[in-house]
């Protein structure tokens, strides 16, 4: 009987949401969630204060007017992973699951269910008999992707050549195109002039 009474007294306390303490930063809510920082890791809470994405170190921060923190847009948040010394970008959902594997040299946050990314293409251009290896060329295009990571449209038709060694030394290439409305993208050409492209 004593155990039963103790159990009844504990029930109200078990229903209380977890308390998150010793946080270094709490962002404003965006897309129904807020980023929280503890040490060098970020996580996300929902509007009830429940931790929905556990603390992790691969979330990409976005520069805002007031601070830098990871954000969700259209149920997607940028992540970055190193592969062979090169940083590749992908996306997670609000359950913390990787929904677009890190594969892009750079990427933007989603906006109206679309994002701009630098997609890498690897082309075998020959074979080196001395080293017994394929000779490969890497180039990338600016592309618009949907929420599954599928390419909707190529923004740059001319491939920009890059070697993984150069990326290791200089960091992620810059995305020059930008959304100016839900279906219009401003694309910067090689002559530093802009063109407007409609994305369906």
PLM feature spans:
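Residue-level detector of conserved, function-critical positions
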Residues: 18-200
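Bacterial Sec-dependent N-terminal signal peptides
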Residues: 1-20
């Amino acid at each position: 009987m004593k155990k039963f009474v103790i159990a009844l007294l504990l029930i109200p306390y078990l229903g209380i949401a977890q308390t998150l303490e010793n946080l270094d930063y709490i962002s404003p809510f965006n897309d129904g969630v807020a980023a929280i920082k503890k040490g060098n890791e970020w996580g996300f809470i929902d509007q009830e204060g429940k931790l929905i994405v556990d603390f992790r170190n691969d979330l990409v921060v976005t520069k805002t007017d007031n601070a830098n923190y990871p954000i969700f847009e259209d149920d997607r948040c940028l992540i970055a992973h190193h592969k062979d010394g090169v940083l590749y970008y992908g996306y997670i959902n609000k359950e913390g699951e990787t929904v677009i594997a890190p594969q892009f040299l750079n990427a933007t946050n989603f906006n109206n269910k679309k994002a701009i990314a630098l997609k890498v293409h690897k082309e075998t251009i020959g074979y080196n008999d001395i080293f017994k290896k394929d000779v490969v060329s890497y180039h990338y295009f600016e592309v618009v992707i949907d929420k599954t990571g599928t390419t909707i449209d190529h923004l740059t038709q001319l491939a920009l050549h890059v070697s993984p060694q150069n990326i290791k030394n200089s960091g992620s290439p810059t995305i020059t195109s930008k959304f100016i409305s839900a279906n219009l993208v401003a694309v910067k050409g090689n002559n530093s002039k802009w063109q407007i492209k409609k994305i369906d």
